[in-house]
Amino acid sequence: MATRDSGGGQQRADRRAEEIDDVATEDTSASDLKERHEKLSEDVDSLLDEIDDVLEENAEEFVKGYVQKGGQ
């Protein structure tokens, strides 16, 4: 009786290699996402600080203008 090689062993090895590649890609993507998140967080913090500064200046001007017009 002749045995037939279906090549299943090779296919399993290929799938295993693909799984390893997928895990490596996920790790790379996760680190890229983490770096991007940190950069965006820094940008948002900077923007919020700038907004706070503008609001403080405008609040002082508003109060000065209100008092000059006779407001209490």
Curated annotation (Swiss-Prot):
Family to which this protein belongs: Belongs to the prokaryotic ubiquitin-like protein family.
According to the UniProt entry, which residue ranges have a biased composition of type Basic and acidic residues?
32-41
Q: Which residues lie in Gly residues bias regions?
A: 1-10
The post-translation modification note in this UniProt entry reads:
Is modified by deamidation of its C-terminal glutamine to glutamate by the deamidase Dop, a prerequisite to the subsequent pupylation process.
| Keywords from the UniProt entry | Coiled coil, Isopeptide bond, Ubl conjugation pathway
* Record organism: Frankia casuarinae (strain DSM 45818 / CECT 9043 / HFP020203 / CcI3)
Gene Ontology biological process? modification-dependent protein catabolic process; proteasomal protein catabolic process; protein pupylation
Q: How does it assemble?
A: Strongly interacts with the proteasome-associated ATPase ARC through a hydrophobic interface; the interacting region of Pup lies in its C-terminal half. There is one Pup binding site per ARC hexamer ring.
- Parts forming coiled coils: 27-61
Question: Which NCBIfam families does the record match to this protein?
Answer: pupylate_cterm
List, alphabetically, the InterPro entries matched: Ubiquitin-like_Pup
Looking at the UniProt entry, the stretches that span the membrane are none
- Main function: Protein modifier that is covalently attached to lysine residues of substrate proteins, thereby targeting them for proteasomal degradation. The tagging system is termed pupylation.
Q: Which GO terms describe its molecular function?
A: proteasome binding; protein tag activity
Keyword Coiled coil among record annotations: yes
Cross-link Isoglutamyl lysine isopeptide (Gln-Lys) (interchain with K-? in acceptor proteins): where in chain: 72
Presence of keyword Kinase: no
Q: Residue ranges of region ARC ATPase binding?
A: 28-66
Q: Which HAMAP family match?
A: Pup
**Pfam families xrefs:** Pup
Modified sites of kind Deamidated glutamine: 72
What is the protein's given name? Prokaryotic ubiquitin-like protein Pup
* Record's comment describing the protein's domains: The N-terminal unstructured half of Pup provides a signal required to initiate unfolding and degradation by the proteasome but is not needed for pupylation, while the C-terminal helical half of Pup interacts with ARC to target proteins to the proteasome.
Which biological pathway?
Protein degradation; proteasomal Pup-dependent pathway
Q: Disordered: where is this region?
A: 1-41
